[in-house]
């Protein structure tokens, strides 16, 4: 499967870890999806999920200046997670920024409110790689 599919699973894993008050580890959360999606790039998923979790404070500080009249805590969980994922990938991978932003926009269209993809696109366009 593609990196796009891996990003969807990484998003769902991060969402699950954020909304549930649980002792579930990242590895355990990823193990749950392995049975249904054995053809995914689990090294990439693990890298992305752990990167977002380990660098969350720095990612939020990178995103905050680009949130006009918003705070990171007021964003929808889905938007916040997508912004963190994309920002981490922009800063820590060799994937072209344009590809990362486009994938984030597509995730937002799939998992967030109708017009939020425009907001996500605008914020990420201002993140320096």
Swiss-Prot record:
Source organism's superkingdom? Bacteria
Listed InterPro entries: NusB-like_sf, NusB_fam, NusB_RsmB_TIM44
Keywords for the protein's UniProt record, in alphabetical order: RNA-binding, Transcription, Transcription antitermination, Transcription regulation
GO BP: DNA-templated transcription termination; transcription antitermination
One Gene Ontology term of the molecular function aspect:
RNA binding
Record's family? Answer: Belongs to the NusB family.
Function (record text) = Involved in transcription antitermination. Required for transcription of ribosomal RNA (rRNA) genes. Binds specifically to the boxA antiterminator sequence of the ribosomal RNA (rrn) operons.
Q: Which HAMAP family match?
A: NusB
Identify this protein by name: Transcription antitermination protein NusB
